[in-house]
A protein has these predicted regions:
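N-terminal pre-domains immediately preceding structured catalytic cores
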Residues: 2-14, 18-215
């Protein structure tokens, strides 16, 4: 009888421990925000709605892609939306979102102008003819953010334009979309910088004449 009672007590204890373990197991879909509150994303994992609903969006460096739609996207059906307030670029196939990626637009004194543009030029390996680095005759950098239009090149020195690979020109006065350092705030000289891991793919999906909306 005592043995039966002991087995029952052990079984009850194990059951209680299992219940406690289940009750305390964290929800993998839940995220603790900075204010201490727990956020549970209401949208299915992997969907664009889920990506945008995350607390770290839009500041995240993460990129969302619809792989199936990406395979169907080419220069005949693509367009880009640049959102200045969120600092995000959206590659679209018609009205459907193909990719959402971080961008970096112009600073307050050199803002990226909103508007609807057509790509005027595409160049894979381009350098700026205005912004870059100034070197002295010994090859030392004397100005890491030089403006060739206003800064004087020292005797024997040189100006080297900043690289702007996978360049897509939007205006003839120097605004374009290209690879560059992506801060999570406006930091460029009016151009729209994009990540090196993203821009070659975006570039491949666009052509001269494709639409880019900056809003």
């Amino acid at each position: 009888m005592n043995a039966v009672r002991l087995i029952f007590q052990i079984s009850a204890t194990v059951a209680a421990m299992l219940l406690a373990s289940c009750a305390n197991k964290p929800d993998p879909a839940a995220t603790t925000k900075k204010d201490g509150n727990t956020f549970k994303n209401p949208y299915p994992e992997g969907t664009y709605e889920n990506f945008k609903a995350e607390p770290k969006y839009p500041k995240t460096y993460d990129v969302w892609r619809n792989e199936e739609l990406l395979a169907k996207t080419d220069a005949s059906n693509s367009n880009i939306i640049i959102n200045l307030s969120t600092q995000r670029g959206i590659l679209k196939n018609g009205d459907e979102v193909v990719m959402d990626y971080p961008i970096c637009s112009g600073i307050k004194s050199r803002p990226t102008p909103p508007g609807t543009y057509k790509i005027l030029e595409k160049v894979v390996d381009k350098s700026s003819n205005r912004y870059g680095k100034m070197y002295d005759a010994e090859g030392n950098v004397i100005n890491g953010d030089a403006d060739a239009f206003t800064d004087t090149v020292p005797e024997g020195g040189k100006f080297v334009g900043a690289p702007m690979k996978y360049w897509m020109r939007l205006t003839w006065d120097g605004v374009g979309h290209h690879i560059g350092p992506v801060k999570r705030y406006p930091a460029s000289h009016a151009c729209i910088r994009g990540p090196s891991k993203v821009m070659p793919l975006v570039y491949s999906k666009m052509r001269v004449g494709s639409t880019v909306v900056v809003e």
